[in-house]
Every structure is written in C-alpha cells, then in structure tokens.
Amino acid sequence: MLHFTITTLTPLHVALGIMGIVRSQQGEEFAALPAMVLRHVDEGNREPVRLPILPGSSLKGAVRAMAEAISPSCVPVADPRVRALLGKHNRCNDVQALCPACRLFGSSGYAGHVSIGDIMFARGDLRRHKSPLLWKPGRDSAFASRYARQGRLQGRKFYVHRSPAEGDDVRVVIKSGASASGRIVYAGGRREELGLLVAALGADPDHPFPIKIGGGKPVGLGSVLINIDRVVILEHTSVEKFLRHTGRLGGVINSEQLEAGLDVAGESAAQWLREQIQLARRTGVLLDDPYQQLREILARDGLQKTAPSGPY
C-alpha cells in the first residue's frame, strides 16, 4: 500500500460533464462546468458537508497513460484509424500474455493489480477560474498528417506544464496549492511493475516530476505533484483472508485490521521505492529513453511560462 500526498500546482478541474450555475460575490450568475464530484461526508454531530473529490478512477487513467508510454505496452484505443497504425502495439487480447500496463491496471477479462481510492480535498479548496475557450480535439481528414509519419504513429501526446492562461470560460476548480492525502493498493502483482507504477506517478525519489490530470490541460490546468510518504506491505495471508471475505481489492484501502510486514516512511520509503524502479529498469519493464523523454516533457520548470490565451 502506498500512502501519498497530492498537491495542486495549478487549478485542478475534473468535470461531471453537465452545466452548473456559479454565483459571484457581486450576485452575477455564470454557467460553469462543475469541477469536481462532491461527496457528502458525515462529521458526527454536525450536518453532512459536501467535499470536492478527485476520483481515483481519474488519477488511475492519467497514470495508466504514462505507464503505457514508458513501458513495452499496448495502446488500447477505439479509433480504427489509430489501430491501423499501431502494429505490434495493438490492444492485448490474451490474458496469458498481457503487456505491463494491462497487467497493472487491467484489461478485458483481467482485473489488474492496482486500486486507487477517491481523494478528498477540503471544502474551502474550491474556486472559480476563468480560462480560454477550448474547441473539441481535431478528428478530421488532417488526422494522419498530424499524428502519423510513413504509416506509423509519431508517438503519444502529452501536455507540458504551463501557468494558467486567462479567458472567458468559467470553471469551478480546486485551487492551486491545495493538498490532500490518498492511498494506492497494489496486490498480487510483480515487483518490477510496481516500480513502473511509481515512475508513472512521477514519484521517483531521484527524478520527481508533476503529472497532469483532468480538463483544461492545454490552458495550464491540472498540474499536480504526487509524493509517496509511506510504504506499507501487508502480510499475504492477511490480505488473502480479507479478499476472500469481501471480494473487493478496493476495500483494502480503508481497512485498518490488516497486518503489516513492512511499514516505512521518509528516507527508508524513498530507498525502497528506488529499489523497485531499478528492478523495473533492469528487467526492461521501464524503458530508459521514453522515461527520460516523459520527464523532459513534464518538467516542472514549464510552469515558469504562461499558456497562450485566446480560443484554442
């Protein structure tokens, strides 16, 4: 189990996809996309409050995309034009011969080994943010000229970090500088693939970098930094008994009744993480060149520049 802290470096926007109304302090009303799923939390004798959350599924999807890019993994896409260009990287279809990313995060007929719980932020972390208007991604006849070269995909697209641009599109966001804690359960997988997971989180103690989550990435939103504070390895028999009883890997996240075989924090945790990443590199699960390229694309010093303003 990995205990981590996530800190927003720019405003974070994860929408429900429906329009909501936001009222300013002056009484003006704006149509805005709700930024976060809001969860009712019972605080004992007080009235339940609604707290903004980052769904674990959103973080898991973002991390999977990076894990696929820095490992010898398939590209599970639906667009037939993309599939025709993938060659050996086409979607896995045999559960006995899955790529590292599919083993980690799951595939059709295979549950995977990673479960990430929802991350709750504080009620006061919500803000209203105005960013440039974004058009839908280009999927027209120019697709091949932008993304393919000599009948093969040029690579994967990742957005660099930028300071947010200003515009007329009102969004509800989690403010920059907000922090929250979360847990990741990794059960039954290979150690080298755990090293791949840590690298994809941007949590390599020697090469940390922020990742991007949610909407508004082109205009500077969604930059977050993840730091793994504590590593807990649970006794196998204890976890096996729990899973037999509940049938839910995610339930391990909130259980306090499992025995720990290893519980380290601080520099001890950092050293343990280094060992997993080194194992991933030695076994070829973590590819050095793509990993270096991803770190350069997502370098934190990109935040010193501002994203372009105006319609995208």
What are these regions (language model features)?
Residues 1-312:
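RNA-binding basic/glycine-rich loop and surface signature characteristic of RAMP-family CRISPR effectors
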